[in-house]
């Protein structure tokens, strides 16, 4: 990722979507969450390389005197550091078999021509000669817009971006065209001619019924065969048993009829990427029980009495959505805004006996709600919102350092031991002695 941030930990969810947490506590872009889920692998924070991280690494080496007094430049020092980082990470096992990976996939974010991408593009230009042609394949993803007024697929943006990329010393081996409808043969041939690739190297990824159709789409267009040839991979061309199972799952997803609706009550509901992992978990759960998922996004501030005074229509619409859902999920969040609305939703779910799941702040607020309305502790609160409360049912943890925002939470995989065998949670986890889940929070329920 070419941004200057060291990691994704302090991003606003509105700007970059959710922050994805890895086993080792790395706070990374949500794309790494997609890679982990789709490939069933476990990544570390070093799998996410940002401009900020590489500059910090090189500057630290310079401060220690590792460059022996030389002037430190973007080329070769930054570019060499990028290449060494990639080579180092490419050898680290990422799945349970513990074997060294045969292929390393590198996603370079941003757009060709971005100033901040330049050191990375130059690094990979050099890299392709170091590792030889048969070990390097460059896939260029480009948008092929289709204005509704004319219906014509426009290839100019693709031509221009490929020309610019070639000018920087990288030639695409595959041009992957993202479009709303399948590419016409004439459009494919045009892209092939102007982008200096064969027509079979122009891959069309058009809109499909579900994301599970995309690997099947790529397989149909011979992408696997292309990789086997160009990278000389030592893999036998065999019947795709795995993709047959995958196709069954994609077909099952498209045939779902019964709907299950979940109200997601949060602060950042205007951008669904803010809760990407929660939404994916709900989708997978719905598919497992053969139901189509309908998520009703509810901004928690719309449930608060103040909204009834200012915008009664929004208030009633929000409550109508909540009441019509089969279950309620309150995800995590930071800060006091919208917390009273979440507590209102939690109280309603408890009284109506609606299935409810609280994650992170959602769970903490469920404890606050129960303390106030069942135990009668009217001022019960989290010390995050009311440090002077006489009933601090949620408190900050010993790991928390209030001074600095970045990297001051309980982060990454943590083991939780069950104290009692007959709890609801223990049964849900299959009567195990402990569970291991990933954490990202500064506060916990007061023991």
UniProtKB/Swiss-Prot annotation:
E.C. code: 6.3.4.2
Reactions mediated catalytically: UTP + L-glutamine + ATP + H2O = CTP + L-glutamate + ADP + phosphate + 2 H(+)
Alphabetized InterPro entries for the sequence: Class_I_gatase-like, CTP_synthase, CTP_synthase_N, GATASE, GATase1_CTP_Synthase, P-loop_NTPase
Places the protein is found: Cytoplasm, Cytosol
UniProt record, GO biological process: 'de novo' CTP biosynthetic process; B cell proliferation; CTP biosynthetic process; pyrimidine nucleobase biosynthetic process; T cell proliferation
Active site per database record: 360 (for gatase activity)
Pathway: Pyrimidine metabolism; CTP biosynthesis via de novo pathway; CTP from UDP: step 2/2
Domain Glutamine amidotransferase type-1 as annotated: residue spans: 261-447
MF (Gene Ontology): ATP binding; CTP synthase activity; identical protein binding
Listed PROSITE patterns: GATASE_TYPE_1 (PS51273)
Domain of life of the native organism: Eukaryota
Pfam families xrefs: CTP_synth_N, GATase
Main subcellular location of this protein, as a coarse class: cytoplasm
Regulation: Activated by GTP and inhibited by CTP.
Alphabetized UniProt keyword annotations: Acetylation, ATP-binding, Cytoplasm, Glutamine amidotransferase, Immunity, Ligase, Nucleotide-binding, Pyrimidine biosynthesis
GO terms for cellular component: cytoophidium; cytosol
Residue numbers of N6-acetyllysine PTMs: 61
Similarity-based family: Belongs to the CTP synthase family.
Function statement: This enzyme is involved in the de novo synthesis of CTP, a precursor of DNA, RNA and phospholipids. Catalyzes the ATP-dependent amination of UTP to CTP with either L-glutamine or ammonia as a source of nitrogen. This enzyme and its product, CTP, play a crucial role in the proliferation of activated lymphocytes and therefore in immunity.
The protein, known as: CTP synthase 1
Native species: Cricetulus griseus
Gene: CTPS1
């Amino acid at each position: 990722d070419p941004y200057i941030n060291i990691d994704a930990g302090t991003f606003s969810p509105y700007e970059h979507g959710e922050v994805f947490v890895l086993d080792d506590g790395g706070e990374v872009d949500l794309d790494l969450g997609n890679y982990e889920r789709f490939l069933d692998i476990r990544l570390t924070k070093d799998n996410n390389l940002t401009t900020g991280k590489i500059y910090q690494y090189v500057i630290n080496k310079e401060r220690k005197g590792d460059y022996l007094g030389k002037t430190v430049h973007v080329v070769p020092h930054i570019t060499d550091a990028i290449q060494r980082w990639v080579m180092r990470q490419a050898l680290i096992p990422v799945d349970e078999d513990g074997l060294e990976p045969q292929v390393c996939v590198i996603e370079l974010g941003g757009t060709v021509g971005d100033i901040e991408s330049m050191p990375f593009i130059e690094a990979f230009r050099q890299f392709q000669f170091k590792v030889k042609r048969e070990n390097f394949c460059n896939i260029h993803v480009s948008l092929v817009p289709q204005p509704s007024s004319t219906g014509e697929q426009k290839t100019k943006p693709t031509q221009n971006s490929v020309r610019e990329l070639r000018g920087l010393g990288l030639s695409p081996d595959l041009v992957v065209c993202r479009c709303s409808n399948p590419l016409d043969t004439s459009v494919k041939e045009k892209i092939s001619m102007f982008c200096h690739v064969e027509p079979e190297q122009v891959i069309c990824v058009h809109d499909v019924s579900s994301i599970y159709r995309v690997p099947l789409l790529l397989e149909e267009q011979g992408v696997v065969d292309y990789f086997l040839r160009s990278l000389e991979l030592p893999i036998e061309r065999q019947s795709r048993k795995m993709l047959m199972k995958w196709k069954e799952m994609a077909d099952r997803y498209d045939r779902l009829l019964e709907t299950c609706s979940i109200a997601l009550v949060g602060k950042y509901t205007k951008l669904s990427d803010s809760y990407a992992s929660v939404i994916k978990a709900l989708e997978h759960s719905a598919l497992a029980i053969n139901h189509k998922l309908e998520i009703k996004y509810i901004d928690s501030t719309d449930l608060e009495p103040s909204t009834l005074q200012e915008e009664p229509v929004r208030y009633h619409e929000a409550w109508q959505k909540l009441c019509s859902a089969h279950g309620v999920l309150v995800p995590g969040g930071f800060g006091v805004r919208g917390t009273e609305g979440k507590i209102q939703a939690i109280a309603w779910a408890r009284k109506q006996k609606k299935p409810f799941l609280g994650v992170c702040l959602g769970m903490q607020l469920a404890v606050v709600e129960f303390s106030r309305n069942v135990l009668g502790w009217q001022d019960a609160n989290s010390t995050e919102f009311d440090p002077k409360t006489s009933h601090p049912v949620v408190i900050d943890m010993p790991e928390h350092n209030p001074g600095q925002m970045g990297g001051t939470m309980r982060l990454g995989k943590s083991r939780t031991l069950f104290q009692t065998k007959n709890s609801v949670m223990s049964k849900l986890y299959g009567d195990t002695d402990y569970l291991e889940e990933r954490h990202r929070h500064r506060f916990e329920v007061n023991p």
